[in-house]
Amino acid sequence: MEPSMDVNSVTISVEGMTCISCVRTIEQKIGKENGIHHIKVSLEEKSATIIYDPKLQTPKTLQEAIDDMGFDALLHNANPLPVLTDTLFLTVTASLTLPWDHIQSTLLKTKGVTDIKIFPQKRTLAVTIIPSIVNANQIKELVPELSLETGTLEKRSGACEDHSMAQAGEVVLKIKVEGMTCHSCTSTTEGKIGKLQGVQRIKVSLDNQEATIVYQPHLISVEEIKKQIEAMGFPAFVKKQPKYLKLGAIDVERLKNTPVKSLEGSQQRPSYPSDSTATFIIEGMHCKSCVSNIESALPTLQYVSSIAVSLENRSAIVKYNASSVTPEMLIKAIEAVSPGQYRVSIANEVESTSSSPSSSSLQKMPLNVVSQPLTQETVINISGMTCNSCVQSIEGVVSKKPGVKSIHVSLANSFGTVEYDPLLTAPETLREVIVDMGFDAVLPDMSEPLVVIAQPSLETPLLPSTNDQDNMMTAVHSKCYIQVSGMTCASCVANIERNLRREEGIYSVLVALMAGKAEVRYNPAVIQPPVIAEFIRELGFGATVMENADEGDGILKLVVRGMTCASCVHKIESTLTKHKGIFYCSVALATNKAHIKYDPEIIGPRDIIHTIGSLGFEASLVKKDRSASHLDHKREIKQWRSSFLVSLFFCTPVMGLMMYMMAMEHHFATIHHNQSMSNEEMIKNHSSMFLERQILPGLSIMNLLSLLLCLPVQFFGGWYFYIQAYKALKHKTANMDVLIVLATTIAFAYSLIILLVAMYERAKVNPITSFDTPPMLFVFIALGRWLEHIAKGKTSEALAKLISLQATEATIVTLDSDNILLSEEQVDVELVQRGDIIKVVPGGKFPVDGRVIEGHSMVDESLITGEAMPVAKKPGSTVIAGSINQNGSLLICATHVGADTTLSQIVKLVEEAQTSKAPIQQFADKLGGYFVPFIVLVSIATLLVWIIIGFQNFTIVETYFPGYSRSISRTETIIRFAFQASITVLCIACPCSLGLATPTAVMVGTGVGAQNGILIKGGEPLEMAHKVKVVVFDKTGTITHGTPVVNQVKVLVESNKIPRSKILAIVGTAESNSEHPLGAAVTKYCKQELDTETLGTCTDFQVVPGCGISCKVTNIEGLLHKSNLKIEENNTKNASLVQIDAINEQSSTSSSMIIDAPLSNAVDTQQYKVLIGNREWMIRNGLVISNDVDDSMIDHGRKGRPAVLVTIDDELCGLIAIADTVKPEAELAVHILKSMGLEVVLMTGDNSKTARSIASQVGITKVFAEVLPSHKVAKVKQLQEEGKRVAMVGDGINDSPALAMANVGIAIGTGTDVTIEAADVVFIRNDLLDVVASIDLSRKTVKRIRINFLFPLIYNLVGIPIAAGVFLPIGLVFQPWMGSAAMAASSVSVVLSSLFLKLYRKPTYDNYELRTRSHTGQRSPSEISVHVGIDDASRNSPRLGLLDRIVNYSRASINSLLSDKRSLNSVVNSEPDKHS
């Protein structure tokens, strides 16, 4: 059997895929082809990656196979990449007679198996596999009737590898083989060396450039093997000495006192008692080869029973006979091992297990030697487990592995915790064991293993060193990505980040709102990704763990110049893969390209390029096409322009000839009519014309010229039509190109046939041909397509503008510890890494999303947010990629780069929206599928009907045929007339205009919306928005700003007793420890009033939910003193301002502009007892509330403003009212929506009083208050059941289910606060007037779609009957070229109609405001209908979920701060069956 060792991989771009069905079709069809091992098609990347056998397939044949399926396949790189393979040696242990042919046929049918070699005499199979497709476990499952044992040449640490391969009398040899470039080299080497007598097995690794050989030294020598390899043209060097079971000469020389065993003795080694164990620190080990050298050399000493070497810990544990050898001798033995560069020291860990060790040996040992065996613990993430059987299977297999102390696998959390001996096994080995069982196992990214000291001896010091403690407590970091849905604004992001950081085991959280993704760093020993996702779900969001989410971020494609041979490739690959954080590196010498996968948190693209540069090569990014050429249709425009000009060049003479012949025909017809000329004379005069003269019998000059001019147009101008028509017919479909090809081909073929017949019959009368039809058809069709693509390019201008905003370069700066600029570097924007400091100069574009760290400026964000006015930026402000810096230079820290930037997400959103189909378009596409066959049938029917009519009543044809001539026969006249009518029917029918009606309008509509800061996710919401009858607003964050602010501070004590500034300082300090939103608002207000960022000290802080807080405050004197100094400074400034013409200095300074009298500067630190809360909290603490204060709180509560009381040292000092203010444009937006005939509803989880107050301010008369999250969905559904289309507008956590349930979900954001998952329509700006604009734009777009459908309907319903000759009696008739012109005009008119949407402008709200000012106004509370809870729907409501319970408790807590006298604890404690 010829081995097929070569396996290649090629990636082919595939255009034309629209759904998953296309992907499956390609994978199934191509996957069945001979020689295909694996195929993976990506709809997102529009590519197919195929692993194949180059002997059976080539990239070109694969491309053609995909082309034949009707897709456009493009091969960017014709040079395939080699695919790594591995060889499994499977030893058969069964004793029965083996069906070798059966095994071979079974395995060869398996995907991923490339070659099988059978050695019946050795009962062994060598199976070559592609590890990325199939693994050893799957191979063994394919032959269940046989018990197979893996004796494969897998890479294992230590001597275990070698001894598992070598039987008695056999030796393992490793030889370095250089110059191998492909798998053909490895297979050739294995084939020739494996045939040598004495060679039992051989495995050649292309990656490591080495050969591992098991041979019998009595049959063949090392030199002979080396010579045979070099004879094949590969330089060979012995990498390791053969493992004879005796010491080498140099070791004997250095260990003269140690007896050396003979070869015979080595095969039956005596078992010595293990008296002691010593741990040595070995410096100088670099790789597994060093480990293997030491482990293979030291056990040859007579008194050493075992050794385990750890490369990670740079240590070795040796068990030996203490009565015969000392640790010092073992140190010398290790240092003598080749290459003799190891530095060995004892780690003071010698365990004596002998019952009576000799006193001499004990004296040689250090006095402080202790017993301290090491145990480490690792966590392995395991996916693919489905039941407890999987858990028991993993625990059973792994626990049997050497070095494993214990294992516990958690099915719920999908991870396993393994306690193991690091000197006997490693985490990677354990992971591979689990993978071989068929599960996916991933090790967390750990910087330092957690070391546990087990069973310390009595001599162990009680106080370990600090360093040991540090090593034990080193945190293990892992990273996961979680897809989060339902986020609508920055408060959602802050909520998730704040709550996750509180959970044990989570180090950091970064949430990207635009991408809907959270990046979490965590300790895998404490918490796992599924648990983190559950925490997020408990917060009210949808959350799923993203598998392999970090792969997309860490893929780098480079062009590497300067490589000359395979050695250069190996040098780059080996150097890069040694770097931490680089998972994979593949360099192709032929294409000079490198493909690298890396962890962006550990290493960045600039670091990788610098590393390659340090090797002496030049590396640069593969330039991506950042242009919008695919949007402006430049290639298609150029193609159709060329086609039009070619057709026009040849068509112009044809049209001239046709017009000349028509004029001459008219001239002779006039003579015939006036002079009563006979038919014979008519024919004679007609043939006397120059163009009608015959060159050959039956062939006139006119027909010859027409044929010559028609040929290039037919086959060059129409080439594209033929290709598209062929592909359509091949897949049993029909499109516009089929109609065009049918019309032109039939006309050309008909004319050519009758011309050949006339020449064959040597006819004296020239036949009437239609060679003029194809050129004229192609001219008008090419012109129409050219104009159509120009117009289509205009429809995507908005998206092209967004893409053009992306910066191409960034200036990265380096700062020192004092933020002083050290250096600047100009890099490609794709090389920017998160955390980079970027400098943006005035007029420059922001290359990435970031946060300002230094500088002040104004930024133009108009092209992204639609906001015309520049936005001020200062340190701490966020900036959006693509916006333009105006005045000052800024330093920003990159937070989101690459595909995660806001601009990239907006571009992606608009692209997806413009390719989505509206429901009306789906109907049009379905209609278009039946249109072409219907037109073909009509055309055939027209041909047959007119032939029948002509033979029945020739007078009709004679009367209405414009080109009738008595010089031709009746039969020819009838056939020509019928043929012309049928061709015209084919030409005028146009399904294109029907198909263009909706997508062009959707493209323009979504593009115009994006330019105005309104992102509409596709055609369906764009079409649905105009049907909306009810608009439901959430209150918090939508109608209101969503952040409470202090509305009023009322001081209830005299100022000389406690000044207002002192009350603010105490209250601000007390509330600074509170996490309640009202507490944060109070703290912010106090800091602003006192003009400070620091407050006093708060101790004994306690919070009672639903009541208030208590604490003790100190250290506010310095704060007050600082405030007094500012007051004095301001007073001085104000006094100097009024010293105009002042004579008396005393009088001039007594100005009324002095703010306050200076307060006494207290220097003694005083402690204040503080209570802040509602009336119930004050009453609990024994305070009496006066009627005036009580009335004031009731008044605030009626207006929806929570009010809290403040006591200092048991004295009521102040009242603070807090409110969530209404947005200024809310009232106007509500009024405009009502004037458009829409019903406006307010739905909120807040209490009825607050809801009524807010509704009265904005003019909403219908309110649903105290609605729980799950009930918002039920209420939207209830409105829908009433037959109303509902639009839900919101931005909060609890709004996302209702947004999904509504017919149109609208999410409001601010700047970068744009949701992707939760809504159908997204506003980049936080402006309620955009709700009006989105509905108005939807109405305009749908109106335009309806107009667009009108054009093709008129063309086809009127044009087809005219073309078929129905209206001949009234003189309406079309020639074929007229039909093609009309068809082209229909498509162009539809696209031009859609372009009128570009004239759309958002309504002028200034005019709206002027026009509606007299009509708008606040509603009185009596006019507002407030419904509490879900009203009549409560009977069918489910029990409250976890989120609803949390919200219920929170509401009770917040509402209890209102002025209502009754306690709301009953609401919390009672079972909320009534949902109110």
Swiss-Prot record:
Top-level taxonomic group: Eukaryota
Q: Where in the cell?
A: Golgi apparatus, trans-Golgi network membrane; Cell membrane
Q: Which residues bind Cu(+) 2?
A: 182, 185
Transmembrane stretches in the record are 643-665, 695-717, 736-760, 770-788, 930-952, 978-998, 1347-1373, 1379-1397
Binding-site residues for Cu(+) 3, renumbered to this chain: 287, 290
UniProt: Cu(+) 1 binding residues? 18-19, 22
State the tissue distribution.
Expressed in most tissues except liver.
Task: Provide the membrane topology annotation.
Answer: Multi-pass membrane protein
Chain sites annotated for binding Cu(+) 4: 387, 390
Question: Annotated Gene Ontology MF terms?
Answer: ATP binding; ATP hydrolysis activity; copper ion binding; P-type monovalent copper transporter activity
Q: Which residues lie on this side of the membrane: Cytoplasmic?
A: 1-642
Of the GO CC terms on this record, one is: trans-Golgi network
EC code(s) of this entry: 7.2.2.8
Identify the enzyme class.
translocase
What PANTHER family does the record point to? P-TYPE CATION-TRANSPORTING ATPASE
> What role is this protein assigned?
May function in the export of copper from the cytoplasm to an intracellular organelle. It may serve as well for the export of other metals.
Name the family. Answer: Belongs to the cation transport ATPase (P-type) (TC 3.A.3) family.
Q: How does it assemble?
A: Monomer. Interacts with PDZD11. Interacts with ATOX1 and COMMD1. Interacts with TYRP1. Directly interacts with SOD3; this interaction is copper-dependent and is required for SOD3 activity.
Give the protein's recorded name.
Answer: Copper-transporting ATPase 1
Q: Which organism is it from?
A: Cricetulus griseus (Chinese hamster)
